[in-house]
């Protein structure tokens, strides 16, 4: 059967770019309310963007992700805009093509490889802390959360780390620009830069991931320029925005949750597990799927050409999957959250984001154990397919640089 949703349903107006914010400036109250409705109606129809399905239940999202025949990753970004003759490699592809391309970059993102960045991340984090520790104030989002992943991603791709603002603008076009024309215009800038980088790396390859991909072959054939542009785009996107928004939300939480902060300071061995629980609660991403054939999920029948938006933050609060889902429980194990995806498209950098968060939290709490939200400035939540805190102004006792 094809279910219908009452006009009073929260699903009807659900829009990841315009999520209602609560008194704390976050959408978490709305997430909980939609979760409550999803307990009886896990999938609903939203009128936003010409109409699309909102999938909110944990098992329903799993069902969509696992059914790669009926749901294509060509709908991963929504609303969609024209990206030219290439795709968002891996994230915007389906198997068997997806698998072949993913294998090219799987090794640099393995736990063994990403653990090697720990010391580099530690140094980078402390350099950033040094830049403001004598001031006693700063925006933890722009000062730390944006910069930590941007610097590492630039190094991985062989880009100048100091051009982080440019990279974030390109990423913004994919995850936060609602206007398709504006998004395509900014995206064209990214493409032009990628073409220049690819041409340079063909003649002067380095040790970075882009050089590795450029010099690789699939079925005996070198990758086309369009494929390489797609690779550059998805590696930039996955490396910068998701981690930045997650870390921003974590700093925001630690600024006011004194009990959690002091517990992690007293027991730093809990930080790795806390990172996973914070990922469950503040996972930044939602993804779309394009329906390619008629399919029924639960009691909802979807038609070819429709889009299904997977609301991971709602599934991460599903009471059938998690005990006390509205609370941060850092001892939670196992923690089968969906914040990093599921199945064949599980986030390639899943281990890297954990390493980045673990190092950032550990080093920050060592240097600045006491801090709070700045009462004279406003925090700001960013909505979109990648959501999280955009500004987190904090104050803290002035300290000394490590170099002194």
Curated annotation (Swiss-Prot):
Cofactor: heme
Binding-site residues for heme, renumbered to this chain: 73, 98, 102, 289, 345, 347
Enzyme Commission number: 1.14.14.133
Gene3D superfamilies linked to this entry: Cytochrome P450
Record field: catalytic activity: 1,8-cineole + reduced [flavodoxin] + O2 = 2-endo-hydroxy-1,8-cineole + oxidized [flavodoxin] + H2O + H(+)
One Pfam family of this chain: p450
A Gene Ontology biological process term: carbazole catabolic process
SUPFAM superfamilies: Cytochrome P450
Recorded GO MF terms: heme binding; iron ion binding; oxidoreductase activity, acting on paired donors, with incorporation or reduction of molecular oxygen, NAD(P)H as one donor, and incorporation of one atom of oxygen
Residues the UniProt record annotates as site (Controls regioselective substrate oxidation): 242
Residues involved in substrate binding: 242
Keyword Oxidoreductase on entry: yes
Pathway: Terpene metabolism; 1,8-cineol degradation
Residues spanning the signal sequence: none
Keywords: Heme, Iron, Metal-binding, Monooxygenase, Oxidoreductase
InterPro entries according to UniProt: Cyt_P450 (IPR001128), Cyt_P450_B (IPR002397), Cyt_P450_sf (IPR036396)
Family the UniProt entry places it in: Belongs to the cytochrome P450 family.
Self-association and partners: Homodimer.
Role summary: Involved in the degradation of cineol (eucalyptol). Catalyzes the initial hydroxylation of cineole exclusively at the pro-R carbon to give the (S)-6beta-hydroxycineole. Cineole is the natural substrate of CinA.
Additional note from the record: It lacks the conserved threonine believed to be involved in dioxygen activation and instead contains an asparagine at position 242. It is the first isolated P450 using the flavoprotein cindoxin (CinC) as its natural redox partner.
Protein name: 1,8-cineole 2-endo-monooxygenase
Organism name: Citrobacter braakii
